[in-house]
Amino acid sequence: MKKITKNLFAATLISVAASALAVTDVDVDNSFKPYTAGFPTVEGITAGLVITKDNVDQYASVLDDGMIKHIKDGWVEITVGEPMDFVLNQGYIDATKAGAKNVKLGAELGEIEGYVAGRAFPEEPSLDDPRAGEKMAWNFQYGYNWGDGAAISPFYWAYKNMNTGKVERNIKFNFYFLNFAHRVNHDPKPEVQPNPSKLFRAIYLNVEEPFDIKNTQLLIQRSQNDLKRDNAWLYLGFQRRVRRLATGQVTDSFLGSDLMIEDFEGYNGRISDMNWTYKGTKTMLLPMYDSSKQNRTSEYNESDGYTYSTYHGKGGCFPNVTYSLRKVYVVESDPVDPNHPIGKRVHFMDAQTFTLPRTVTYDRQDKYWKSWMIGQAHPDSHLPINKGSGVSIDDAFGMMDVQSMHCTTGQFKGIIDPDLIKLKQFSVQYMRSFGK
């Protein structure tokens, strides 16, 4: 039995290695430009269509089961917008062409070899490949989400009762992202130096309002070695001290919201923390759009005139944005740790950008638990500084806990500007000095 298993595993590795060597520029072009021959079409679905509980059955093939249920229950209606081509940054595409042929999976989950920068596995996934889901996960992990570095400043969260729509709490954050390695567009490339801890990426955030949690901060450092655990520290403003987060705390509610730290960006964890299964490719409606054509609000009175996304539907929990037909990879992730609080996530990955505009979470009894939506604005329709950046801009999120009937929403002001990112922000020492 051991010999058979070993032979099968060896065959898988040979297949993976061969597929990596077979990557061509045509594969890369097809991956980044899947709509060269035109956008996908589905009978009856055109810009301006409103999908309601009265007609949702007609369009069920382009929606996930959770969204179909929400529409049937009268929680939300979806308006279809014009399709847009979200071509990513040319530096990221060039890095893919230069390096993808050298990339292969390692022997263990979470191991990758030969990767430098760009999209790790641009070839089309196959249901016959038992590790296709893992490859898709790496494409997300090494995606161009926020580029080499960016800020969300400010970032407004609201905690809402889904039954009444009452806003229970508002928090004003500032988020900062920095890729220490695998950089493709902004110097230093391909890696920040010095980088003695061999970090891949870091996230730093602080709370600006309300006063009772002002100066609360979170720092997450992710290693280039996916088998090493993330380092995470929390500074609570009222305690005025930094404490390291234990592994299990990244799956606790973050500051009383409906999100775990692991939920950030659709999934904020290691590849090795999950088993990944590719379930197929579909044409689906995703919240990807021209932000200049959405219903926006000036409620925060930004000095530059920037307007934010609005919300509608049950409890005001759904981003009020248009959806467009997209090529989607369906990937399931289930925790390696049997004590993890979730049973599985179903990710609907946008095939062009490898962002996660839609993720559905099930509990350990396989019951529908959480609904994640994150609206993606085309950069050329967003802030002037984002135009031409080739970054699909996170613009509006809604995380609904459908079991407790509660949600958290987030309105972004995402800025692709390396001058806003300071290396010193991504250290414990900075957290202490900022909190004083």
Model feature map: region roles:
Residues 214-216, 228-229, 340-345, 357, ...:
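Short, surface-exposed coil-to-beta transition loops
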Residues 1-21:
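Gram-negative bacterial Sec-dependent N-terminal signal peptides
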Residues 163-165, 170-196, 200, 205-209, ...:
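Extended beta-strand-rich segments in extracellular/periplasmic secretory proteins, especially
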Residues 23-230, 236:
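Solvent-exposed N-terminal domain segments of exported/luminal and surface proteins
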Residues 23-124, 239, 250-318, 325-327, ...:
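Non-transmembrane domains of secretory- and envelope-associated proteins
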